[in-house]
């Protein structure tokens, strides 16, 4: 077999790679996603080499112009790397030498692919975090606008998937806005550790060439530099942290999706899916399927899997760089795509894909025993110990179930057989709207408290 002279590292070898191994080893098919970031990092590195006098300013300018030419060719669809290029870094370097000649060979001075790929991945992820943050804001706004319209719409609240207490629908939707805010805060925190430059750490031990890591860090708008070169090239904590934050985003979306799926079923019938976000059956003409939330619920497992894969990958790696790290790219690329698409899909679903069936919701909150706690509270207000009141109401509910009658339908005389303290005002307490309105503790579902939450979120999201 002929010697693989096309490889930058081939002079150490006498024979070329087995074709299958060459393809197995290559990452160009997916790390081409890092092209923009690789060019940005290389331009910053070239400028630094010129400033430091490691190459002449003219050479630095030629390198930068050549890299910008590659950017233009890529934009025009003319930059087409092949498997033999191995990865995006070698593909760029090879193309640069083709464009500007031997001076292109000076670009890699004082740099290794180990610190280069870490830099590229951080630059790429920094942008994607900012994009996901905006996608989360869109979801928050979609939920908020629906919540603002439904302050006085009531919906059953559940524990153990059993009806518990009625809620303001706005309160229910605001809970997911809170989750999304925590997701945003987590991403903001992860971004701080993404935004540290490894460039200049070289292969693992730094370099003897008089580079300036601070110059490249500033050029690329990093917050600072790694203080340990070994850690710089071997750190993938930021990938794990991002995948952890992404997993929680998907967990929240999956919970929301599950509720939409339940609400759309005939058994709940709380919402009607519009034609814009539902599909039909190839066999059963009556079906309208909640494919969007089902897909999001299913896709959550992909991101969870990538997190587990990354943790498993890094747990046994000795310092410093190992080829295993190549596996982080597809995990993070797919996770970003999955999270972004899922956020957009769920946002569209709440913007134009569902309608709450208010008559059905009203029927649901008026035909159960979710007001039982308020009967106990009624007695507590008359100085009966809560546990005693709780036990009494339990017996009342048992009687109601046995007789097939709701609490609101007991005549006053029957109420008094349970306890002498029951008066006519018990009926007002039993109304679902009264039950909700009375929950005035901070963060509660009482209309006043929810209105306060709505005003606060409008200020945060729209000002």
From Swiss-Prot:
| Assigned GO CC terms | cytosol
Name the major location.
Answer: cytoplasm
Its annotated compartments are: Cytoplasm
* Catalytic activity field: 2-(N(omega)-L-arginino)succinate = fumarate + L-arginine
Pathway field: Amino-acid biosynthesis; L-arginine biosynthesis; L-arginine from L-ornithine and carbamoyl phosphate: step 3/3
An example Gene Ontology biological process: L-arginine biosynthetic process
Enzyme Commission (EC) number:
4.3.2.1
Q: Which GO terms describe its molecular function?
A: argininosuccinate lyase activity
State the SUPFAM superfamilies in the record. L-aspartase-like
Q: Which PROSITE patterns match?
A: FUMARATE_LYASES
Which spans are transmembrane here? none
Q: Which family does it belong to?
A: Belongs to the lyase 1 family. Argininosuccinate lyase subfamily.
Q: Which PANTHER family match?
A: ARGININOSUCCINATE LYASE (PTHR43814:SF1)
Identification of the protein by name: Argininosuccinate lyase
- Organism of this sequence: Prochlorococcus marinus (strain NATL1A)
């Amino acid at each position: 077999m002929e010697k693989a002279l096309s490889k930058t590292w081939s002079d150490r070898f006498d024979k070329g790679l087995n074709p299958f191994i060459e393809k197995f080893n290559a990452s160009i098919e997916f790390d081409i996603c890092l092209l923009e970031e690789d060019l940005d990092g290389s331009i910053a590195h070239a400028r630094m080499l010129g400033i430091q006098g490691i190459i002449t300013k003219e050479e630095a300018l030629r390198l930068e112009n050549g890299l910008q030419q590659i950017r233009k060719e890529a934009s025009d669809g003319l930059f087409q790397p092949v498997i033999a290029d191995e990865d995006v870094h070698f593909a760029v370097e090879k193309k640069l030498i083709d464009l500007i000649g031997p001076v292109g060979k000076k670009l890699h001075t004082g740099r290794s692919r180990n610190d280069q790929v870490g830099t590229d991945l951080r630059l790429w992820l920094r942008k994607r975090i900012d994009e996901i943050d905006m996608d989360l804001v869109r979801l928050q706004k979609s939920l908020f606008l629906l919540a603002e319209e439904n302050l006085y719409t009531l919906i059953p609240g559940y524990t153990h998937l059993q009806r518990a207490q009625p809620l303001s629908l706005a309160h229910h939707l605001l809970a997911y806005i809170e989750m999304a805010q925590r997701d945003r805060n987590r991403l903001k925190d992860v971004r701080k550790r993404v935004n540290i430059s490894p460039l200049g750490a070289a292969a693992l031990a730094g370099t003897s060439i008089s580079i300036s890591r601070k110059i490249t860090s500033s050029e690329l708008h990093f917050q600072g530099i790694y203080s340990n070169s070994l850690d710089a090239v071997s750190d993938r904590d930021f990938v794990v942290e991002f995948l952890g934050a992404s997993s929680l985003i998907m967990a929240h979306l999956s919970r929301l999706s599950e509720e939409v799926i339940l609400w759309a079923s005939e058994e709940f019938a709380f919402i009607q899916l519009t034609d814009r976000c539902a599909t039909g059956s190839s066999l059963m003409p009556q079906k309208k399927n909640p494919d969007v939330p089902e897909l999001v619920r299913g896709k959550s497992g992909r991101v969870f899997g990538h997190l587990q894969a990354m943790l498993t990958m890094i747990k046994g790696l000795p310092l410093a760089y190992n080829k295993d790290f190549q596996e982080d790219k597809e995990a993070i690329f797919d996770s970003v795509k999955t999270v972004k698409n899922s956020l957009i899909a769920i946002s569209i679903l709440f913007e134009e894909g569902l309608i709450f069936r208010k008559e059905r919701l009203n029927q649901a909150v008026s035909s159960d025993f979710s007001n039982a706690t308020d009967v106990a509270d009624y007695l507590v207000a008359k100085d009966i110990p809560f546990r005693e009141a709780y036990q009494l109401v339990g017996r009342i509910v048992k009687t109601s179930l046995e007789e097939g009658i709701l609490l609101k339908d007991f005549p006053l005389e029957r109420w008094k057989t349970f306890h002498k303290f029951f008066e006519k005002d018990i009926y007002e307490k039993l109304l679902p709207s009264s039950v909700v309105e009375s929950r005035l503790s901070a963060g509660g579902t009482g209309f006043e408290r929810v209105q306060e939450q709505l005003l606060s979120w409008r200020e945060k999201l729209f000002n």
